[in-house]
């Protein structure tokens, strides 16, 4: 016991710093590494995004117990949630809020009877953000099979990545989002395990919102920093 007390006295400043950092990251803000391309082109593999854990709730440190509701997710928010279905922390975009009636056919969303509008900004996406074929992984998707479109999400414009030739997995019939749930999709519409696979997202699983990156490291290029993606608004 004396040894423990002595260790604490010797390192109390360091221990206090560690405790404060743990509390801060569990209740106020955190950094989330994005390992997949399900949110391309908005978020790419290797991005470290800032998670605002006070966006919707005040949470008890370490336990993720919600003490006070501050707000609810809005359509278009990029949310971070702990999915019990996939047993993983996921990052997706909210496209349906409670009360919405949503369907998707041929990668075109219809929300409350309004078919969303899409426009093409660039003829070809930036190849640095795309999966390209390689001898090590021949199943990766080639550049000319995907295109990026601007999606008007009922007033919020953002980019989505879709398969040029369509995909049956992008289709679902009308779904009414019940109270306490959200419908979330990846911006990379044909390569995302989202509400089409794991179902609607319970409000209680949502832990925060992201609006910008902190930094980005390129996993395909020896983790070289992508300076143009530092502090990038999403």
Model-inferred region functions:
Residues 2-7, 23, 27, 32-33, ...:
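Soluble "head" domains of membrane/secretory-pathway proteins
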């Amino acid at each position: 016991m004396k040894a423990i007390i002595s260790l604490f006295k010797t390192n109390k400043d360091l221990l206090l710093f560690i405790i404060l950092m743990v509390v801060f990251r569990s209740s106020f803000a955190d950094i989330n590494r994005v390992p997949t391309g399900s949110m391309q082109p908005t978020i790419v593999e290797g991005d470290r995004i800032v998670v605002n854990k006070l966006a919707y709730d005040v949470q008890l440190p370490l336990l993720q117990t919600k003490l006070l509701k501050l707000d609810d997710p809005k359509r278009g928010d990029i949310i971070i949630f702990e999915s019990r279905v996939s047993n993983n922390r996921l990052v997706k975009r909210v496209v349906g809020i409670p009360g919405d009636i949503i369907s998707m056919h041929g990668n075109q969303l219809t929300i409350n009877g309004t078919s969303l509008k899409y426009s093409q900004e660039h003829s070809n996406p930036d190849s640095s953000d795309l999966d390209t074929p390689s001898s090590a992984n021949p199943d990766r998707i080639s550049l000319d099979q995907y295109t990026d479109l601007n999606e008007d999400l009922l007033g919020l414009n953002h980019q989505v990545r879709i398969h040029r030739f369509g995909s049956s997995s992008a289709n679902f019939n009308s779904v009414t989002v019940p109270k306490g749930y959200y419908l979330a999709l990846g911006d990379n519409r044909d390569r995302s395990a989202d509400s089409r696979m794991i179902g609607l997202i319970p409000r209680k699983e949502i832990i925060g919102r992201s609006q910008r990156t902190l930094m980005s490291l390129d996993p395909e290029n020896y983790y070289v920093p992508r300076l143009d993606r530092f502090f990038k608004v999403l």
